[in-house]
Swiss-Prot record:
Binds 3 Mg(2+) ions per subunit. Pathway: Carbohydrate biosynthesis; gluconeogenesis. It comes from Ovis aries (Sheep). PANTHER family: FRUCTOSE-1,6-BISPHOSPHATASE 1, FRUCTOSE-1,6-BISPHOSPHATASE-RELATED. This is Fructose-1,6-bisphosphatase 1. It catalyses: beta-D-fructose 1,6-bisphosphate + H2O = beta-D-fructose 6-phosphate + phosphate. Belongs to the FBPase class 1 family. Gene3D superfamilies: 3.40.190.80, Fructose-1,6-Bisphosphatase, subunit A, domain 1.
Length: 337
């Protein structure tokens, strides 16, 4: 006989974890309220994603969002869920969503001190073929003394107090980065709670996978072409890198975090400013990767150092294991001469 119980009676839920962190920092508890509310939305989206075919949520809603992407029915549902739960958390004052042209200003009676930027359903072009998709979020403190406005969201990623993503894959995982590091929580559907499964996650110093859409290779700049060539045909005859690209940022970045390597969505001739959005895609992912010991750059500067000028601003991004990103930057510097 073993003394080990078949059921862990001392589980660490995301609520318990954030409350413990808040107690150490002598916080007000507003962050716990906010993340609890966000988890409620993530659970609801996870359920909707898994029921989408039965509930007729596949297909296009007949509109495009502010960045020109076709809006899917699940996008609309997910956006409404996140907006409503964040407003009712009494912890937010400004919300920025990929799906809304302007920032959402929370009603005075529901306002708190946080600004949240989010992509409610990233990778939604993959919904119909059942590829993993996700929700991305970044949380800032309001720093101005004025009434809440769109300007409160135009902060560099260095000001983030928390960021992360939910991945709706073979299981639903929440990856949360805060000042002390990155922690992963798995949704246990039996009890409806996110359970801590990986504490203080660190990315490998060097990986063996590169990830980008090589369909755009004719528009790559010389540095990127040279880097990819080196990964396929290493000059020192070492093993070539594997190529993995899902086309869903959450899935690609999560794999990079877990296995190491490099993820690239660079600028090219067709998209000189890149295609991914700074506030609710690049900054949160860069924050997660940096807190895990990795690097995130545009090729010219650290993603987290950029001061946004527009809530839907686009930037190039290269992130991942520090040695892999450094190698790319060295090639970039060398080819620019």
């Amino acid at each position: 006989m073993t003394d080990e119980a078949p059921f862990d009676t001392n589980i660490v839920t995301v609520t318990r974890f954030v409350m413990e962190e808040g107690r150490k920092a002598r916080g007000t508890g507003e962050m716990t309220q906010l993340l609890n509310s966000l988890c409620t939305a993530v659970k609801a989206i996870s359920t909707a994603v898994r029921k989408a075919g039965i509930a007729h949520l596949y297909g296009i809603a007949g509109t495009t969002n502010v960045t020109g992407d076709q809006v899917k029915k699940l996008d609309v549902l997910s956006n409404d869920l996140v907006v409503n739960v964040l407003k009712s958390s009494f912890a937010t004052c400004v919300l920025v969503s990929e799906e809304d042209k302007h920032a959402i200003i929370v009603e005075p009676e529901k306002r708190g001190k946080y600004v949240v930027c989010f992509d409610p359903l990233d990778g939604s072009s993959n919904i119909d073929c059942l590829v993993s998709i996700g929700t991305i979020f970044g949380i800032y403190k309001k720093i101005s003394k004025d009434d809440p406005s769109e300007k409160d969201a135009l902060q560099p990623g260095r000001n983030l107090v928390a960021a992360g993503y939910a991945l709706y894959g073979s299981a639903t995982m929440l990856v949360l980065a805060m000042v002390n590091g990155v922690n992963c929580f798995m949704l246990d559907p039996a009890i409806g709670e996110f359970i801590l499964v990986d504490r203080d996650v660190k990315i490998k110093k060097k990986g063996s996978i590169y990830s980008l859409n090589e369909g755009y290779a004719k528009d790559f700049d010389p540095a990127l072409t040279e880097y990819v060539q080196r990964k396929k045909f290493p000059p020192d005859n070492s093993a070539p890198y594997g190529s993995r690209y899902v086309g869903s940022m959450v899935a690609d970045v999560h794999r990079t975090l877990v296995y190491g390597g490099i993820f690239m969505y660079p600028a090219d001739k067709k998209s000189p400013s890149g295609k991914l959005r700074l506030l609710y895609e690049c900054d949160p992912m860069a924050y997660v990767i940096e807190k895990a010991g990795g690097m995130a750059t545009t090729g010219k500067e650290a993603v987290l150092d950029i001061v946004p000028t527009d809530i839907h601003q686009k930037v190039p991004i290269i992130l991942g294991s520090p040695e892999d990103v450094t190698e790319f930057l060295e090639i970039k510097k060398y080819t620019a001469k």
